[in-house]
Amino acid sequence: MHNRAVKQYLEYLKISGIQDIFIKPPIQIDKTELLKGLEEKYKNCTNCILHEKRTNFCYGNGNADAKLMIIGEGPGADEDKLGKVFVGRSGQLLTKMLSAIKLSREDVYIANIVKCRPPENRNPLPEEKSACLPYLDEQISVIQPELILMLGKVAAVTLL
């Protein structure tokens, strides 16, 4: 609203008999705690067949206030074992790539399209991706990154 419109609105309220206006301060949200709560809420997901053989639900990890969010395809064997994203060979490569551009894993948030490991590291099926996309949408909404880097064809095709 422009100043003139605000002034007119306040005049209207005064004429209407309203004498006091109370404005609540914006609510501060701890994004890290919110993401932990969402992970806790979804970690026992059974929305697709991937849950049947998973060891761990790999929600995502990193800086909840990151300007850069990195999204991959899905967890591999190492990730499934540890419950963290990008910790295997591809994670080591990602760490080196980030270092080359003067970033660390603590500067970014990393997630995947699917949160459970597809068998034999196959590409996630459409219904598996559909089951996990609401979780990823929530992560993106909480983090509100300035930039999203999609790693690989599955991530790019799914999100574009």
Language-model segment annotations:
Residues M1-R4:
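Short, small/acidic-rich helices and loops at N termini and domain boundaries
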Residues Q8-L160:
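A polyanion-binding, active-site-adjacent surface
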